[in-house]
């Protein structure tokens, strides 16, 4: 499987080629390669592979990307990319590593905390270490073989509220990996700055995001790029994508903020892919450019 969009195996469709002249990706993982997460992480086991990082940054530069927001990793790969990005005329933002609750999703890539006191200390340390923002993991993943199913429930609303409050008190914007209507609603009501993924939302969750100025980064590529791969149930993948695209359209119609982010590095999502723009354009129609430009500008303002 190709891991960079400039690879010969990647052929853009006409809708992808007609997308925006100045591109940004508001959710990537420099440490991952879109094919094999264990192999990708091992690439940096002896220290950050600068050759890899430069190759990825060059790919984004050639495709016209000017802004990248990393979801973080605990091996300092995103931090290295940030230090080099200026050479490629790219603004790069990173939380350094995401923070996840012990026993819950995210430990494969992030730092674990056992309680709120430990989390607060980690947030303070992020300030000292130079993080641009805080990334929290507050839910599980979609089960791509079963529509409507998540791999685990979200954290309790009161915990979500405290996580966001602590980070805001330190002066950080907060990016939240969040799926499920109640989890996203709780995060939005607590003032989270952006929601990543956001599967299976309902009207209450969408309104909460709209009323609280939450930017939604739906990462449709993590679903749409699974089609035809044979890895998951095709009917389930199609249903999950349809649900997400319907919610994207509904959120835009109510004036919500939506920004493009591929989750590049996730399986079947190569760095530099323009698939997110194509999927969002399909969901948003002729207003796509205006909607996404507005959302992307807000991400860049907040983060």
Residue ranges and their predicted role:
Residues 34-39, 184-190, 223-234, 244, ...:
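Histidine/acidic-residue-rich catalytic or RNA/ligand-binding cores of hydrolases
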Residues 50-78, 89-99, 131-144, 173, ...:
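Divalent metal-dependent hydrolysis catalytic cores, especially in the metallo-beta-lactamase
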Residues 33-47, 102-113, 145-153, 227-236:
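Acidic/histidine-rich helix-loop elements
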Residues 23-84, 103-106:
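Metal-associated gating/positioning segment near the N- to mid-region
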Residues 29-33, 74-78, 100-101, 140-144, ...:
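Active-site environment of divalent metal-dependent phosphoester hydrolases
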Residues 9-13, 18:
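Short, positively charged and aromatic/hydrophobic N-terminal segments
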Residues 117-137, 143-216, 237-258, 290:
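Histidine/acidic residue-rich metal-binding segments in metalloenzymes
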Residues 241-303:
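His/Asp/Glu-enriched, well-ordered alpha-helical/loop segment
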């Amino acid at each position: 499987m190709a891991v960079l969009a400039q690879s010969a195996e990647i052929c853009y469709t006409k809708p992808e080629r007609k997308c925006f002249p100045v591109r940004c990706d508001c959710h990537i993982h420099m440490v991952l390669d879109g094919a094999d997460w264990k192999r990708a992480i091992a690439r940096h086991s002896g220290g950050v592979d600068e050759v890899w990082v430069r190759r990825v940054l060059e790919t984004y530069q050639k495709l016209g990307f000017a802004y990248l927001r990393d979801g973080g990793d605990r091996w300092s790969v995103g931090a290295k990319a940030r230090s080099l990005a200026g050479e490629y005329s790219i603004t790069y933002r990173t939380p350094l590593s995401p923070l996840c609750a012990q026993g819950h999703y995210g430990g494969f890539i992030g730092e674990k905390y056992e309680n709120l006191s430990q989390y607060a200390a980690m947030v303070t340390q992020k300030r000292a270490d130079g993080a641009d923002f805080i990334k929290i993991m507050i839910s599980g993943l979609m089960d791509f073989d079963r529509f409507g199913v998540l791999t685990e429930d979200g954290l309790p609303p009161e915990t979500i509220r405290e996580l966001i409050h602590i980070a805001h008190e330190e002066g950080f914007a907060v990016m939240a990996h969040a799926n499920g209507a109640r989890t996203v609603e709780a995060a939005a009501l607590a003032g989270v700055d952006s929601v990543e993924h956001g599967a299976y939302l309902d009207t209450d969750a969408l309104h909460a995001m709209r009323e609280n100025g939450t930017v939604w980064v739906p990462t449709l590529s993590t679903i749409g790029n699974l089609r035809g791969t044979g890895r998951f149930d095709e009917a389930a993948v199609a249903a999950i994508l349809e649900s997400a695209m319907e919610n994207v359209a509904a959120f835009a119609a109510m004036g919500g903020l939506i920004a493009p982010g591929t989750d590049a590095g996730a399986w079947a999502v190569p760095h530099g892919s323009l698939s997110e723009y194509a999927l969002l354009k399909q969901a948003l129609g002729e207003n796509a450019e205006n909607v996404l430009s507005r959302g992307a500008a807000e991400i860049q303002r907040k983060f």
